[in-house]
A protein has these predicted regions:
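Alpha-helical phosphate/pyrophosphate-handling elements in metalloenzyme active cores
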Residues: 5-37
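Active-site flanking loop/helix segments enriched in acidic
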Residues: 1-9, 67-73
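Metal-dependent nucleotide-binding catalytic modules
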Residues: 29, 42-200
Length: 200
C-alpha cells in the first residue's frame, strides 16, 4: 500500500475517532451518519493515493509545507480543483449526503465559513459569540447543521496531521468549540484525550 494511501486511511480513522468523541454522544440518534460520513469523507482521494501517490505527495509538499496557492498547484497537477474531483466522485459513488454537503460547503459556502470563523476566534468571550450568532439567525442555522460534524472531524484530523498547535489546526479547534459551545481548553483537552485513547 502506498504511503499516501495508508496516511489518508489513518487520517480517516482519526476523523472517525474525533467525530465519535466530540459529536456522537451529543447527537446520539445521528451516530451512524456521523461515523460513516467521517470515515468516508476522504475516500474520494483514495484512488489517487493508490494510483498516483506522487501527485498527492507533491501537493502536500507545495501547498502544506511551502505555502503555495492550492488552486494553482491543483490546476498544474490535476487540471482541476481537488475539491471538484472529490465532489464528482462523491456524487458518482453516492456517498452519504453529509459527505456531499461538506464538499459543497468548502467549494460554495466559503463566505459563511469565514464569518463563522471570525466569531469562533473570539473564544475568550462566549457571551459576545452568542450575541453575534443571535444577531444572524441564518448563520446560526448554517453553523448548527449536524452535517457539519463530518467536516469538523475531518478538519481536526487533517490539520493534526500537520501540527497540533499550528494555525490550521487552531482554526478547526475554534470552529469545533463554537459548534459545541465549549471552550478552547475543553476542545484541546478532548483532542489530546482522544489521541491518547486511539494510540492504545
Amino acid at each position: 500500500i502506498p504511503v499516501a494511501l495508508r496516511q489518508l486511511q489513518l487520517i480517516s480513522q482519526h476523523a472517525t475517532q474525533q467525530a465519535n468523541g466530540f459529536f456522537a454522544g451529543r447527537l446520539a440518534r445521528l451516530w451512524q451518519d456521523i461515523h460513516w460520513g467521517s470515515l468516508l469523507f476522504l475516500s474520494p482521494l483514495w484512488p489517487i493515493a493508490l494510483t498516483h501517490p506522487q501527485l498527492l505527495e507533491e501537493w502536500e509538499l507545495r501547498v502544506i509545507h511551502k505555502g503555495e496557492s492550492a488552486r494553482k498547484v491543483e490546476k498544474q497537477l490535476f487540471g482541476v480543483r481537488l475539491l471538484d474531483i472529490c465532489l464528482a466522485l462523491v456524487d458518482i459513488w453516492r456517498l452519504p449526503i453529509w459527505v456531499q454537503q461538506g464538499y459543497r460547503l468548502l467549494l460554495n459556502e466559503q463566505r459563511e465559513l469565514v464569518k463563522v470563523l471570525r466569531i469562533a476566534r473570539d473564544s475568550d468571550h462566549p457571551l459576545r459569540q452568542q450575541n453575534r450568532l443571535d444577531d444572524d439567525p441564518t448563520l446560526r442555522r448554517w453553523l448548527n447543521q449536524p452535517a457539519n460534524t463530518v467536516l469538523l472531524a475531518n478538519g481536526l484530523a487533517l490539520s493534526a496531521q500537520q501540527s497540533w498547535d499550528g494555525p490550521h489546526s487552531q482554526r478547526w479547534q475554534f470552529l469545533t468549540g463554537l459548534y459545541l459551545q465549549i471552550s478552547m481548553d475543553e476542545v484541546q483537552q478532548q483532542l489530546h484525550q482522544q489521541a491518547a485513547n486511539s494510540a492504545r
